[in-house]
Amino acid sequence: KFVAVDSAATLLNKIILEGSSTKADIILGLDMSLFDVANRSNLFAKHKVGNINKQIRLPIKWDSDKFIPYNYGYFAFVYNNKNLKKPPLSMNELINSTKARIVIQDPRTSTPGLGLLTWMKAIYGDNAGNEWKKLNKKIISVTKGWTDAYYNFFMSGEADIVLSYTTSPAAHIMFENNFDISASIFDEGNYISIEFAGILKTSKNKKIANDFLKFMLSDDFQSVIPSTNIMYPVTNINNLPDAFKNLEI
């Protein structure tokens, strides 16, 4: 049985509130911005999948004996290249130069929204608050989730730029043959997003849960990640759909 909620942050909060009374065996869909909170919650058991770093290929070393990564990507500001001829090429340009209308997601309820907080902090450190004040003048809406921001604001034309992922253009290419959507690759770098899964300590089905985590690293599971979750698989990136091959990152 699968139970879905509208965001990773909501999912983790739900599990924390349920505590030892939760009926969940596995939680999946968390990302790096929630890693520390999940790790400190003391709700997750060590997995029995073996040495993860021998089984996966990530841009960074994976350092956890509780959580299994299953896909990754990078946060980015996405725009229509037919409408926006001079997109921002850095966070500095986005904040200080662009006149474009921007839509982002609420960090309290959205993974990309929380990722942007971390991204800004990584770039600006203690000065992030001042940069946020300047960026806020360009933001026309802060939505609860990604779908509302992307489709109801960006794709409708109400916003020029939306917070999303570097892989978002691949979806438009694969499913619409639309090459008009691009992602800005920033000079400061684009912050990585790794999604992962973990087993709850209270699970009464730990063997089955561990078998499922192993399945998540199998070719059968990983091969459909690019076309379903529009992210990079963690085990083999050599057989990506053509739409992914021209992405900068």
Indicate residue ranges for each PLM-predicted region:
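A ligand-binding cleft/hinge motif common to bilobed small-molecule-binding domains
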Residues: 33-37, 155, 159-180, 229
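Mature extracytoplasmic/periplasmic domains
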Residues: 200-249
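Short beta-strand->loop
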Residues: 45-53, 65-69, 92, 161, ...
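Extracytoplasmic ligand-binding site segments that recognize negatively charged/polar headgroups
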Residues: 6-13, 22-159
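Periplasmic-binding protein-like
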Residues: 56-57, 73, 133-136, 143-144, ...
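A bilobed periplasmic-binding-protein/Venus flytrap-type ligand-binding module shared by bacterial periplasmic
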Residues: 76-83, 121, 193-208, 224-227
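Short, catalytically relevant binding-site loops at active-site mouths
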Residues: 150, 167-171, 188-190
